[in-house]
């Protein structure tokens, strides 16, 4: 892609690479599942059957949110532009309380692990704060009862197969004092006000999402899903990699796979920058494409969503990036 030839190690295992080209309007979940199935057929590697055994590289975090099912939580915070770093890192306080305290408590409670429930409460609940507990020597039974009652009230939100919103969970722990939630939670839980801070509005909208979206978001930001960004895996390698090229969903302007594959023409800015020897969206995209594709140790599937499948195919062949038998139109 960048006119540099890469020399494989003499002892390297021969890998498999495939380019799957599909219309940008196709169902992405279906396409990517079908691609994984086709990789099993072409490689004989059943690791492609298990979503946990291959890495899917996407351009932007919101593409993972839509695929992994936490868009309702993620998009209001992303669109507000007020939480960029903390959203990526998983360090927004209201979300951290839910992911680091409530989620482990829920797992322990629902699995009947009373020891772990007690451990989480003793370590994190102000109701059983060491200082409070010691000064309340004559009232320790009451403190324990209050903590147990707070846990039961929280867990009732999941009774009868119900799924509470993140707001409902926050309200419960604030009202009972089970965990310390911070002053901003009061504003988030209050009714909307026209003169309120934009952050509060975005948080309230995001936290109206069902709690399972918080669980999925927490898994994603802790790198416990198959998704990662093209930029975020530099220097890392994985046995099986699916690189997803989807300009329409990415919404950015710095990179363009449609330009790289000849579907869209260069912009005037691209042409001027190329003439001046500066970076263009094509050179930036070529470098990013190289980084993403070289993350695979055994097999690589590239899924290109496009408005012109034939052009992508012809460009890939004309440039010698892929052989004819390595390309599928899905």
Predicted features along the sequence, with ranges:
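The feature marks helicase ATPase cores and/or their adjacent C-terminal helical subdomains
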Residues: 1-330
């Amino acid at each position: 892609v960048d006119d540099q030839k890469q020399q494989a190690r003499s002892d390297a295992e021969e890998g498999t690479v495939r380019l799957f080209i599909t219309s940008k309007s196709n169902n992405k979940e279906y396409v990517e599942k079908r691609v994984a199935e086709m990789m099993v057929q072409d490689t004989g590697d059943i690791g492609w059957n298990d979503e946990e055994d291959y890495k899917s590289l996407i351009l932007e975090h919101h593409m993972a949110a839509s695929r992994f099912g936490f868009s309702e939580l993620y998009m209001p915070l992303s669109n507000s532009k007020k939480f960029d770093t903390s959203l990526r890192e998983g360090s927004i306080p209201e979300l951290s309380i839910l992911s680091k305290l409530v989620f482990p408590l829920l797992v322990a409670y629902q699995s009947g692990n009373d020891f772990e429930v007690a451990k989480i409460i003793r370590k994190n609940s102000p109701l059983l704060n060491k200082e409070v507990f010691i000064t309340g020597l004559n009232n320790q039974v009451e403190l324990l009862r209050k903590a147990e009652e707070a846990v039961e009230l929280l867990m009732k939100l999941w009774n009868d197969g119900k799924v509470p919103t993140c707001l409902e969970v926050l309200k419960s722990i604030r009202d009972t004092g089970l965990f310390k939630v911070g002053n901003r939670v009061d504003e988030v839980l209050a009714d909307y006000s026209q003169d309120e801070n934009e952050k509060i509005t975005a948080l309230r909208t995001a936290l109206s999402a069902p709690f399972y979206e918080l669980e999925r978001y927490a898994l994603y930001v802790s790198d416990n899903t198959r998704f990662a960004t093209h930029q975020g895996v530099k220097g890392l390698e994985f046995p099986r990699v699916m690189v997803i090229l989807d300009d329409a969903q990415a919404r950015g302007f710095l990179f363009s796979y449609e330009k790289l594959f000849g579907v869209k023409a260069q912009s005037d800015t691209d042409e001027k920058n190329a003439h001046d020897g500066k970076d263009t969206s094509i050179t930036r995209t070529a470098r990013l494409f190289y980084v993403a594709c070289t993350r695979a140790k055994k097999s690589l599937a590239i899924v290109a969503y496009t408005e012109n499948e034939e052009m992508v195919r012809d460009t890939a062949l004309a440039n010698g990036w892929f052989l004819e038998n390595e390309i599928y139109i899905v």
